[in-house]
């Protein structure tokens, strides 16, 4: 997030991982990007990972799915409409990200869109979220 609240998408992973690999990926991104917090959806495998990372002292924002996927995407749709989202030019994952975004909500896959949707919600509510972490 820039000081002007623009969304920067600097990295993107898409794939199915078992829980141990999910934790490794979460740790990898934590260390790679020197995050102030991490956001994890609080359902399925995320519940246990949230508990473990919190017990390790990591600041975790628990994401709760509310409404349908289109409703959750509203904040990010507005970021895109206002040209406040930037993708890393030339990134190997960029084609997959853009395909999922362009096919949403009727595409075969929308996992990456879900992540972008949550990012938009987090940025939109940044002040209240950061103080609550």
Regions inferred by a protein language model and the residue ranges of each:
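Charged alpha-helix within mobile-element recombinases
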Residues: 100, 105-123
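Gly/Thr-rich phosphate-binding beta-strand-loop-beta motif of the actin/hexokinase/Hsp70
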Residues: 1-2, 115
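Low-complexity, compositionally biased segments
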Residues: 14, 45, 113-117, 128
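Short coil/turn segments at secondary-structure boundaries
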Residues: 88-92, 112-117, 131-132
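Mg2+-dependent endonuclease catalytic cores in nucleic-acid-processing enzymes, primarily RNase H-like
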Residues: 2-104
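Intrinsically disordered or highly flexible coil/loop and linker segments, enriched in small
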Residues: 32-35, 85, 110, 125-129
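Acidic two-metal-ion nuclease catalytic site recognized across multiple nuclease folds
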Residues: 119-133
């Amino acid at each position: 997030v820039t000081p002007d609240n623009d969304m920067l998408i600097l990295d993107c992973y898409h794939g199915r991982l078992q829980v141990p690999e999910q934790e490794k990926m979460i740790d990898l991104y934590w260390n790679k990007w020197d995050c102030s917090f991490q956001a994890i959806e609080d359902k399925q495998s995320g519940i246990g990972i949230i508990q473990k990372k919190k017990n390790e002292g990591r600041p975790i924002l628990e994401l709760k799915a509310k409404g349908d996927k289109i409703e959750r995407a509203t904040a990010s749709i507005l970021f895109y409409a206002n040209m406040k989202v930037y993708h890393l030019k030339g990134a190997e994952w960029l084609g997959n990200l853009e395909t999922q975004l362009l096919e949403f909500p009727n595409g075969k896959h929308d996992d990456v869109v879900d992540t972008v949707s949550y990012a938009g919600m987090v940025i939109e509510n940044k002040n209240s979220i950061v103080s609550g972490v």
